[in-house]
């Protein structure tokens, strides 16, 4: 038995938690460089604000309607997510963190001692008490059905109280008959159009379709979905995220970069951040790649994009080695005379240990005290805030940094941003 817990309008809700003056007002969160809408609360949805709406096209409408805009505050969202997930882990013996704002909880055995709907209400109330965030809870025998139950809990929140238990077969079929097939987890626009052309219009139609027909006309993924809709668990709980195959750190610049020193600062910063992520995964890497590109949509400007990579002989997780390799790659592809829009650093070829056969000609032999130094650096930055300790190559005045003109305070992670009671 699974419960899917999903925070309602997560990014927008994180902003209103610390701004009670915004309760009941339309709130949206913008993407990198304040480009377009990536999150909106119920009040903003009621005004017709759509995901992906460009901010510069909608700012007059937002001003007239009193829509409050925020730049993406990822540091705040990550910390609030950790608080939600920690609460769920206290309430359930096993939890799979599916994304920043949703998780699957294992309820095996719970139904033997608790009413599942009451337990879902307890989850909802506890998360609300500890974080002031509202979650929808969908409960069912499979992950796909739990997703469907969660969808119903959020769509009909007033009637359901934000909790839907679909463990009853009759309730399952009643809900499935009321929902279009594209509401099913994992079914995109292309597949839903094909299903519609075959006369499969509702979720119940799909659940009742012969498995042999699905296998013949589609793939094993959709077959698994149909089995899950019938209450047959095909997707197990994954408590530990699979090991990453690569790490990418890239951004679009707030202002176009035209000079080499600024680009080198950006690449150093991205390499340092990628190395930090690598260490958090307890991995070492040998492959470091750098890419730079101009905008393909710029008028009267030639497009240029290129990448280069370095393969180290010895796996490393030391920021100094990774920055050195990334800047060497930059030197191989840099061309003056362009207005660069984006750059990034990618790490690959991971190892669980930084061990390799060395010879006299290795140019990146392990540095003495490397692990201890990186641990001190990560610990200090985690405690005092990212960027407290950084490399000189990252620069001080980073004019190219991502634009976040409407950034809210980092209320939970920066002592300087703590709320003050007057």
Predicted regions and their residues:
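Gly/Gly-Pro- and Ser/Thr-rich, intrinsically disordered tail segments characteristic of DNA damage-repair
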Residues: 1-227, 236-237, 367-422
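Short, hydrophobic beta-strand segments
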Residues: 103-109, 307-313, 357-362
């Amino acid at each position: 038995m699974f419960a899917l817990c999903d925070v309602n309008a997560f990014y927008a809700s994180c902003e209103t938690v610390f701004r009670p003056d915004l309760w009941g007002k339309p709130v949206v969160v913008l993407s990198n460089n304040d480009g377009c809408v990536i999150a909106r609360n119920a009040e903003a949805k009621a005004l017709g604000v759509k995901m992906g709406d460009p901010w510069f096209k909608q700012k007059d409408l937002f001003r007239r309607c009193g829509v409050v805009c925020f730049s993406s505050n990822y540091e705040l969202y990550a910390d609030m997510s950790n608080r939600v997930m920690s609460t769920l882990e206290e309430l359930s013996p096993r939890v799979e963190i599916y994304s920043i704002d949703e998780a699957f909880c294992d309820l095996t055995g719970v139904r033997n001692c608790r009413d599942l709907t009451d337990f879902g209400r307890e989850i909802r109330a506890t998360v609300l008490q500890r974080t002031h965030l509202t979650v929808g809870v969908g409960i069912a025998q499979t992950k796909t059905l739990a997703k469907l139950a969660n969808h119903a809990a959020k769509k009909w929140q007033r009637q359901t109280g934000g909790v839907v238990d679909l463990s009853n077969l009759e309730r399952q079929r009643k809900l499935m008959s009321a929902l279009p097939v594209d509401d099913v987890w994992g079914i995109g626009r292309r597949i839903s159009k094909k299903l519609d052309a075959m006369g499969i219009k509702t979720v119940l139609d799909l659940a009742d379709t012969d498995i042999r027909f699905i296998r013949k006309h589609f793939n094993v993924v959709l077959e698994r979905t149909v089995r899950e809709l019938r209450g047959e668990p095909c997707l197990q709980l994954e408590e530990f995220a699979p090991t990453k195959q690569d790490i990418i750190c890239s951004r679009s610049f707030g202002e176009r970069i035209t000079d080499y020193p600024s680009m080198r600062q950006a690449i150093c910063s991205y390499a340092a951040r990628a190395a930090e992520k690598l260490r958090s995964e307890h991995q070492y890497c040998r492959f470091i790649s750098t890419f730079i590109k101009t905008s393909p949509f710029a008028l009267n400007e030639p497009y240029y994009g290129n990448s280069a990579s370095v393969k180290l002989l010895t796996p490393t997780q030391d920021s100094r080695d990774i920055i050195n390799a990334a800047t060497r790659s930059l030197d191989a592809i840099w061309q003056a005379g362009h207005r660069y829009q984006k750059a990034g650093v990618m790490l690959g070829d991971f190892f669980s240990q930084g061990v390799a056969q060395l010879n006299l000609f290795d140019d990146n032999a392990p540095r003495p005290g490397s692990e201890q130094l990186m641990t001190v650096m990560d610990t200090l930055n985690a405690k005092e805030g990212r960027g407290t300790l950084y490399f000189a190559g990252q620069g001080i005045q980073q004019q190219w940094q991502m634009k976040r003109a409407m950034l809210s305070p980092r209320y939970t992670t920066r002592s300087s941003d703590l709320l003050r009671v007057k």
